[in-house]
Amino acid sequence: MPELPEVEVSRMGITPHMVGQTVTKIIVRNPKLRWPIPEEIQQIEGQVIRKVTRRAKYLLLHTDVGYAIVHLGMSGSLRILPASIPPEKHDHVDLVLSSGEVLRYNDPRRFGAWLWGLPDLDHKVLSQLGPEPLSNDFTAEYLQERAKGKRTAIKQFIMDNKVVVGVGNIYANESLFSAGIHPKRAAGEISPEKIALFVDEIKSVLAFAIEQGGTTLKDFKNADGKPGYFAQELQVYGKGGKPCPRCDNPLSEMKIGQRASVFCSECQK
């Protein structure tokens, strides 16, 4: 599933091709995604794309009359292609641009979304989200306050989008390992010093993943159709039973909140 770095890489890739371009046509080949694509999205036709932003794992394509909201779901990707290239099997949505290019949305599992929001109003999918992890709003003081008294396992806690957005399973595993925190430890029992380190590691891991083009485990490709390379930098995710990169102790694996968690029982307390 594309997580925050992969979505940010997609944003960076499509922005130079889209900003300032007019959407001459929107082609919806299959409206049945995670939620039905609303008829209102047709309003994007004839509009200039003013900017492309990201909120959590949603991409926002802004125009003067509203904004398209794109979520990549489990297997979605966005490509910039010449409009003359015919669509393939799982190409569900095209935005045809005045430049002669097309923004093409491919989603084999159809668990992504295309929605429509009105100017200056948060769509309901955006209204309850926590701060961005790479922003100045996500601080040790903020996380310490949110964690106070919480018995929830820190891994589940940090993956809650109401606490902070975009720290998905891959990056939660990696950040907890880097900070030396056991994933089942109660969020409210972690010291201020460890919380501060954890916040720093989350920011560092996510920033490095973006620099590496995201993580491609199966489906993700960027706007040029290329995979991300952060998978080569993973320290623990997907490596249960292999030696810890710090102490050589075999890495443990368990399910926490129905998600695979890999950690070192020696290095993470």
UniProtKB/Swiss-Prot annotation:
Assigned keywords, A-Z: DNA damage, DNA repair, DNA-binding, Glycosidase, Hydrolase, Lyase, Metal-binding, Multifunctional enzyme, Zinc, Zinc-finger
Active site residues according to the UniProt entry: P2, E3, K57, R259
Sites where the protein binds DNA: H90, R109, K150
Biological processes annotated in GO: base-excision repair
Reaction(s) this enzyme catalyzes, per UniProt: Hydrolysis of DNA containing ring-opened 7-methylguanine residues, releasing 2,6-diamino-4-hydroxy-5-(N-methyl)formamidopyrimidine; 2'-deoxyribonucleotide-(2'-deoxyribose 5'-phosphate)-2'-deoxyribonucleotide-DNA = a 3'-end 2'-deoxyribonucleotide-(2,3-dehydro-2,3-deoxyribose 5'-phosphate)-DNA + a 5'-end 5'-phospho-2'-deoxyribonucleoside-DNA + H(+)
Stored SUPFAM superfamilies: Glucocorticoid receptor-like (DNA-binding domain), N-terminal domain of MutM-like DNA repair proteins, S13-like H2TH domain
Keyword DNA damage: yes
One Pfam short name: zf-FPG_IleRS
FPG-type Zn finger ranges: 235-269
Note describing how the cofactor binds: Binds 1 zinc ion per subunit.
Transmembrane annotation, as ranges: none
Gene Ontology molecular-function annotations: 8-oxo-7,8-dihydroguanine DNA N-glycosylase activity; class I DNA-(apurinic or apyrimidinic site) endonuclease activity; damaged DNA binding; zinc ion binding
Cofactor: Zn(2+)
EC code: 3.2.2.23, 4.2.99.18
Coiled coil: none
Sequence similarity: Belongs to the FPG family.
Record function comment: Involved in base excision repair of DNA damaged by oxidation or by mutagenic agents. Acts as a DNA glycosylase that recognizes and removes damaged bases. Has a preference for oxidized purines, such as 7,8-dihydro-8-oxoguanine (8-oxoG). Has AP (apurinic/apyrimidinic) lyase activity and introduces nicks in the DNA strand. Cleaves the DNA backbone by beta-delta elimination to generate a single-strand break at the site of the removed base with both 3'- and 5'-phosphates.
Subunit record text: Monomer.
Protein name as catalogued: Formamidopyrimidine-DNA glycosylase
Organism field: Photobacterium profundum (strain SS9)
Gene: mutM
